[in-house]
């Protein structure tokens, strides 16, 4: 039996789900190797403008910032961005954290050299 819901309802459900658990701990346990691998595959270098879509707590954003790239981490869930901001601060990294919907990003076309997403973009309904 399918449950019909609007995109807005689905996104609100995702936002609540990601904010309700201990996602940062889960990242540390299961997903930590994924970010550096993605960054390595993207061959980032100093000065590149990088957007991490559905960045969560910065699993890929932080390793991207370590390359010297200018990084913007965007996510639908402010609680995850807060956790990422704390991780970045503890690591001495500077990057921008932006609450944003992957389906309605607030950036001009061609604002970035590289756009990446570790796993989060797959949750967007379209």
Regions found by a protein language model. Give the residues of each.
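A short acidic, Gly/Pro-enriched loop at the edge of an enzyme's catalytic core
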Residues: 103-115
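Residues lining the SAM
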Residues: 117-121
């Amino acid at each position: 039996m399918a449950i019909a819901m609007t995109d807005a309802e689905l996104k609100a459900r995702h936002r609540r789900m990601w904010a309700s658990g201990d996602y940062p701990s889960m990242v540390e346990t299961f997903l930590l190797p994924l970010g550096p691998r993605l960054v390595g595959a993207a061959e980032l270098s100093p000065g590149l403008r990088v957007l991490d879509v559905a960045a969560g707590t910065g699993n890929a954003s932080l390793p991207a910032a370590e390359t010297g790239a200018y990084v913007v981490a965007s996510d639908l869930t402010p609680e995850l961005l807060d956790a990422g901001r704390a991780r970045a601060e503890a690591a001495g990294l500077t990057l921008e954290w932006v609450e944003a919907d992957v389906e309605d990003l607030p950036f001009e076309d061609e604002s970035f050299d590289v756009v990446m997403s570790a796993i989060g973009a797959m949750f967007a309904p379209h």
